[in-house]
């Protein structure tokens, strides 16, 4: 079964073609600057690599371009569009309506549209990608894989805020958690790597990148996630503030004469390690280099980030009454060995000891804790596209079984 995985943003569209039987990535690419000047990147497992300017007025143009590339006689990996069995779409926010992957029907699109207020930057862009694919491949099965679905096993004690309950009843204001596709893949891969049954282990996954979240997974089910009603809550991130006292926002608004939209822009785009470093950078590599040159604010930004991560790990270990695996993933989690080491220095109370040599290894999966460590600490390369393909293939298989 060949799966086309689509991750549609407001002005970009990432894609992969995956053979679900072998899990081989046949082709991958990126359509950027849609509606502006347009850029198309395309690579195949056969060694073809293309990057070229391509005018794309809208997402339909982008999908048409990627499909044309996939079936090109010289550069393509497919004989025709008909070889695509399923299109798996990454959908950011499904609210409480969706607890798993679903066939994208008109009813699903309507339900997602009703969730647009919960993710105004992401959901409309996701749906534009769906519409473009439906227009060009009307007979192909479309499956939606929600970034919030994996977190829907959280209990009310974890997802409710200390607000009047009527606001939850009326507006569904609660904690949803994000990065669920990544957390699901990485927690399962960690258990597989360690030869464990995921239904018998307690895992904390640290998805650390420009956007960061931590997820507590007990026996295969999420019990908590550091992100909340929006991806703004939780850790200090690249440009996002993470947890902050709401009272400070009222104070700031009064002092700086700011409205709510200006405040939200600051919290989302001007805060995090970028803000702490006095606008030096949101890139952890650049902050590390600056810290080596005695830039105190750059070092402080990284220090605060590591401290907050360690605090969440400690609280989730308590919430699960123990932890078997702690897993680092995503751009910072996979590649910044110094940050991992700094985080783990706070976790000695859990009996964690880190192997300095292993911690600097680059691999798809590696255990970086010493053999005597009471908790397994791992680095696992996330693969959201593969997880989407797996879930899309599973939905397609269920439909096929129902017909037989």
Q: What is the meaning of each model-derived region?
A:
Residues 70, 74-122, 149-160:
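Short beta-strand-loop/turn "lid" adjacent to the catalytic site in phosphate-handling enzymes
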Residues 186-193, 300-321:
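Phosphate/ATP-binding catalytic cores across multiple sugar-kinase/actin-like superfamilies
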Residues 256-301:
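A mobile "lid/hinge" subdomain adjacent to the ATP/sugar-phosphate binding pocket shared
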């Amino acid at each position: 079964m060949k799966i086309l995985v689509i991750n549609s943003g407001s002005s970009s569209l990432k894609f992969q073609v995956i053979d679900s039987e072998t899990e081989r990535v046949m082709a991958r690419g990126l359509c950027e600057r849609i509606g502006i000047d347009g850029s198309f990147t395309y690579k195949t497992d056969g060694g073809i690599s293309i990057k070229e300017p391509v005018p794309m007025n809208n997402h339909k143009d982008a999908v048409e371009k990627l499909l044309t590339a996939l079936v090109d006689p010289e550069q393509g990996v497919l004989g025709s569009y008909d070889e695509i069995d399923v299109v798996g779409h990454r959908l950011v926010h499904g609210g409480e309506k969706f607890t798993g992957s679903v066939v994208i029907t008109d009813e699903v699109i309507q339900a997602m549209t009703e969730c647009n207020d919960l993710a105004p930057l992401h959901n409309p862009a996701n749906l534009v990608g769906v519409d473009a694919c439906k227009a060009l491949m009307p007979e192909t099965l479309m499956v939606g894989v929600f970034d919030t679905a994996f977190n829907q096993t959280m209990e009310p004690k974890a997802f409710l805020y200390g607000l009047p309950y009527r606001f939850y009843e009326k507006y569904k204001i609660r904690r949803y958690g994000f990065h669920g596709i990544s957390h699901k893949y990485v927690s399962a891969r960690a258990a597989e790597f360690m030869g464990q049954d995921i239904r018998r282990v307690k895992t904390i996954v640290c998805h650390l990148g420009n956007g960061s979240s931590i997820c507590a997974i007990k026996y295969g089910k999420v019990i908590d996630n550091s992100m909340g009603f929006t991806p703004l809550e939780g850790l200090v991130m690249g440009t996002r503030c993470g947890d902050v006292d709401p009272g400070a926002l009222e104070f700031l608004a009064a002092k700086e004469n700011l409205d709510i939209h200006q405040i939200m822009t600051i919290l989302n785009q001007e805060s995090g390690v970028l803000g702490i470093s006095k606008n030096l950078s949101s890139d952890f590599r650049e902050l590390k280099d600056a810290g080596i040159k005695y830039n105190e604010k750059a070092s402080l930004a990284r220090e605060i980030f590591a401290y907050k991560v360690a605090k969440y790990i400690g609280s989730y270990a308590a919430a699960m009454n123990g932890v078997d695996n702690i897993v680092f993933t995503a751009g910072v989690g996979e590649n910044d060995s110094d940050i991992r080491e700094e985080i783990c220095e706070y976790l000695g109370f859990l009996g964690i000891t880190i192997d300095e040599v292993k911690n600097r290894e680059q691999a798809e999966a590696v255990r970086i804790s010493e053999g005597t460590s009471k908790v397994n600490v791992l680095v696992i390369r996330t693969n959201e596209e593969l997880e989407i393909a797996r879930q899309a293939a599973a939905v397609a298989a269920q439909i096929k079984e129902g017909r037989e």
